[in-house]
Regions:
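PP2C/PPM-type serine/threonine phosphatase catalytic domain
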Residues: 1-241
Length: 241
C-alpha cells in the first residue's frame, strides 16, 4: 500500500510504502513534512513493538510527532515522539529513525532501535545507522551472540534518553536516502538493497520494489521503506526546462 506522497520540494522528491505481510497487524508507520519556502524537511519511519493495534498506534503517533517537531536537532524529534507516547499510556512502544534537513546540504539523522538509514550516492551504498540491538551490543564487546539477539532492541521511543539516542550526519547534495524497518533490511541482503536503489527510476518505484522484494524473499514481518531523492541544481533546472 503506497502512501501516495511523492512531491517536489526544490530538488527533493520522496515517497513511502508499507505492507503488512503475513502479520496480523501492520505496526509500521511513515511520515514526512516539507517546507519548500524555508528549505526544511523531516522524514520518519517507525516500527511498533509487537503485532497488535497498540503497537500500530505507537508507531503512528511517534512518526507524526517526530516530523511535527520544529527542532533542527533530530534528537529533539525523537524526544517529541517520546512525549507523544507518554501522553497516551494505553499505546504501546516503537522504534524510530528520523532524518531532518540540516545546515547547507547536511542531513541530520537520529534513531532508537533497529530502523535504519542508508545513503545511495556515487555508486555506493552506505549504512548510516547502527542497530540498537542486543546482538550489536554483544558483538562490539567481542561477546558470543545467540540466535534471536538481532531482534531484541536495547532502545525504544518510550525509553529514549538524549545520551542513548543514536545520531549521525551526512552530506546530501545528490543521492538517494533510504529509511526502512527491519522487515526490509533484515530480509534483503545489502547487494539487493543496492541494486534496487540503483535501478529504480523514482522514489515510488524504489519503495515499491524494496517492499515487494522483501516479501517475495519470505519476509515474515511488516515491511516499510521511505526514499528521498536529492538531485543537483543543474539537473533539476534541466528537467524543468
Amino acid at each position: 500500500m503506497s502512501t501516495d506522497n511523492t512531491m517536489p520540494i526544490g530538488q527533493l522528491r520522496w515517497d513511502a510504502t508499507s505492507a503488512r505481510g503475513p502479520r496480523a497487524t501492520n505496526a509500521d508507520a511513515t511520515a514526512g513534512r516539507t517546507d519548500p519556502a524555508a528549505g526544511r524537511w523531516a522524514f520518519a519511519v517507525a516500527d511498533g513493538v509487537g503485532d497488535n493495534p497498540a503497537a500500530a498506534h505507537a508507531a503512528r503517533a511517534a512518526a507524526d510527532a517526530a516530523v511535527a517537531a520544529t527542532a533542527a536537532d533530530p534528537r529533539g524529534a525523537i524526544l517529541a515522539a517520546r512525549e507523544a507516547l507518554a501522553d497516551q499510556p494505553d499505546t504501546g512502544d516503537c522504534v524510530l529513525v528520523v532524518a531532518v534537513a540540516g545546515a547547507e546540504h547536511a542531513c541530520e539523522i537520529a534513531w532508537v532501535g533497529d530502523c535504519r538509514a542508508y545513503l545511495w550516492a556515487d555508486g555506493a551504498l552506505r549504512q548510516l545507522t547502527e542497530d540498537h540491538t542486543l546482538a550489536v551490543y554483544f558483538r562490539t564487546r567481542n561477546l558470543p551472540v545467540t540466535p534471536g539477539m538481532d531482534h531484541v532492541v536495547t532502545t525504544s521511543v518510550r525509553t529514549a534518553e538524549p545520551a542513548l539516542i543514536g545520531r549521525t550526519q551526512v552530506t546530501l547534495r545528490t543521492g538517494r536516502l533510504l529509511l526502512c524497518t527491519d522487515g526490509v533490511h533484515k530480509t534483503l541482503p545489502a547487494a539487493r538493497l543496492r541494486s534496487i536503489l540503483e535501478r529504480a527510476a523514482t522514489p515510488a518505484d524504489a519503495v515499491a520494489d524494496l517492499v515487494d522484494a522483501a516479501h517475495r524473499l519470505g519476509g515474515q514481518d511488516n515491511a516499510t521503506a521511505l526514499v528521498v531523492d536529492r538531485t543537483a541544481d543543474h539537473a533539476a533546472n534541466s528537467s524543468a526546462a
